Amino acid sequence: MTLVELEELLGCGTQINFKMKKIGILTSGGDCGGLNAAVRSIFFRAKNTYGMEVLGIQDGTVGLMQRPVAFLPLDYQTFSGSLLRQGGTFLGTTNKGNPFRFPMSDGSFKDRTQEIIDGYHELGLDGLIVIGGDGSMSILTKIAKKGNLNIVAIPKTIDNDVGATESSIGFNTAVNVATQALDNLQSTAASHHRTMILEVMGRDAGHIAINAGIAGGADVILIPELNYTIKGVVDKLTEMKNRGIVHSL
């Protein structure tokens, strides 16, 4: 199911007929800002527009592996407090790795995907909404095909590296934090006449670096999408020093 179909499912597009009465929501991978707000939004749309029963799966796919399945029945009371303003995910999450090769306590690895599929059916779910990054989406796509499950994926990654997605949940917060870090480094760099280096997350994607670097006034921004050399960086900093600029980021 595509994100366009998700919008239709949750009432943002054309009304469609369907038989879904019970859905689950889980968060997978690393935590980030915006997760609780996303879960809340899904719940209110599913409940208010379609009268669905909504279950929150605890600790990502690990919750579906547990017996009994670890879940929270979501209701209006769940979201009545300050949950919306809290970081992280109140459902819990996991980044233990691939459930097709799940690490066991004895050091071995085991395919536990059938347990996830069985947990889905044990709860009587008509569909599952997964909020996760590229790794989670890749894994859940395989599980959906294996078990013939109805799964919708919502992109969540501070790296913003999910294809065909302009911006993912968590990215904006990550850029704001990195920009604030650069702002804080400016005064120290100026006081000591030094070059300060800020390393940010992103793996093979430079979205955080380029956006925070521009917003925070970085003098040199290195991203994996573009080749660079140490000599090129040194030449740039030397040029700045020759112009009387004695500190840099």
Model-derived regions: residue spans:
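A cross-family phosphate/adenosyl-ligand binding-site feature
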Residues: 16-28, 38-124, 135
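Short, glycine-rich nucleotide/cofactor-binding loops
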Residues: 26-35, 201
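A glycine- and small-aliphatic-rich helix-loop capping segment at beta-alpha/alpha-beta transitions
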Residues: 40-48, 70-77, 142-152, 169-173, ...
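Short gly/pro/ser/thr-enriched loop/turn and capping motifs at secondary-structure boundaries
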Residues: 62-64, 98-99, 137, 157-162, ...
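Accessory alpha-helical/coil subdomains and C-terminal extensions
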Residues: 119-121, 127-132, 138-142, 147, ...
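Acidic/polar active-site rim loop that often engages polyanionic ligands
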Residues: 154-167, 190-191, 215-216
